[in-house]
């Protein structure tokens, strides 16, 4: 079986729109959460989000394909441009090559376009008032469809949609395809737009934070006793996953090797995690490398009352006979980017591995008793990270664990 490495990445997020900006935010514990006037005007309880701040959108007119692109696709497109440059890939190396593919998706979908179409029909303006591009803009697979067309990808081309584990599954699936020799290189990740049309669905569940609307940067507070729900976010992220010999043959810089991947199902509840599924997932990922010590664990931790505690208990069980790793929750800075959070957190972890630090879990004023003595990093901690594990979980009991080793 082949060895699989990461040779580049690109990111659009609430804490920065490139490697340099994101690194600065991570290292200094800077929150990307802001007040949302749109959520307030929509009558929502939660009025904070991790919005994306882009100064210009000239790229939107780059190609006729842009008519089919939603904001999530645009964020993923910008991320892929960065990733190609970061991986030092030349056009002739990835275009029209059947050994190079893309797997990228969205967890939340794009309901704003469904709403636009329905509003047009209900206003009696007729079917002719509905944009013919809505069907593509609204579908979850629009991201991989648009990117594969724009970048002339000839290999695999599809989206995975598994709630907040989406881009984690995209990465894991890409890893396995390369490991078993079916592809040489895959662009993996996803995109998620930030909109009240998506946020209200979670606000209706009372899953979002609402107690810190007047102090947005304090609203995402994983492991603090006063946490009251997650903060919705979004963005784009693409990583370049490559077969080791392929990467070496072109003298590529290698950030890390993917040495473990597992995906499991709770099979228990639609919204409340079982914990057992997470334990099995981490154990299966670790089982692929015996005598492996994990230096750092980037938790799924979203700032919900129940979910954070269940994941902590799962970590305790999974590492019961091992030394517990250092832990931090980057969503305390970024908010929850839903389907793109998995690839975002792999990128955050890659930056920490490269620059020898662990980003803090911010906003912990009074730590949850169950989180005490769990090696949770609350201030930037300087440490060489050789191996790291990242968790992504989603509604319906879907779980992903990925393990990276510094190359």
Curated annotation (Swiss-Prot):
Sorted UniProt keywords: Acyltransferase, Cytoplasm, Fatty acid biosynthesis, Fatty acid metabolism, Lipid biosynthesis, Lipid metabolism, Transferase
Ketosynthase family 3 (KS3) domain boundaries: 1-406
Cross-referenced Pfam families: ketoacyl-synt, Ketoacyl-synt_C
Pathway assigned to this chain's UniProt record: Lipid metabolism; fatty acid biosynthesis
Keyword Transferase attached: yes
GO biological process, one term: fatty acid biosynthetic process
Annotated localization: Cytoplasm
Presence of the UniProt keyword Transferase in the record: yes
Reactions catalysed: a fatty acyl-[ACP] + malonyl-[ACP] + H(+) = a 3-oxoacyl-[ACP] + holo-[ACP] + CO2; (3Z)-decenoyl-[ACP] + malonyl-[ACP] + H(+) = 3-oxo-(5Z)-dodecenoyl-[ACP] + holo-[ACP] + CO2
EC numbers: 2.3.1.41
EC class: transferase
Record-level GO cellular component terms: cytosol
Gene Ontology MF terms: 3-oxoacyl-[acyl-carrier-protein] synthase activity
Catalytic residues in the record: 164 (for beta-ketoacyl synthase activity), 300 (for beta-ketoacyl synthase activity), 336 (for beta-ketoacyl synthase activity)
Organism superkingdom: Bacteria
Function: Involved in the type II fatty acid elongation cycle. Catalyzes the elongation of a wide range of acyl-ACP by the addition of two carbons from malonyl-ACP to an acyl acceptor. Can also use unsaturated fatty acids. Catalyzes a key reaction in unsaturated fatty acid (UFA) synthesis, the elongation of the cis-3-decenoyl-ACP produced by FabA.
Protein family (similarity comment): Belongs to the thiolase-like superfamily. Beta-ketoacyl-ACP synthases family.
Assembly information from the UniProt record: Homodimer.
Protein name: 3-oxoacyl-[acyl-carrier-protein] synthase 1
Organism annotation: Buchnera aphidicola subsp. Schizaphis graminum (strain Sg)
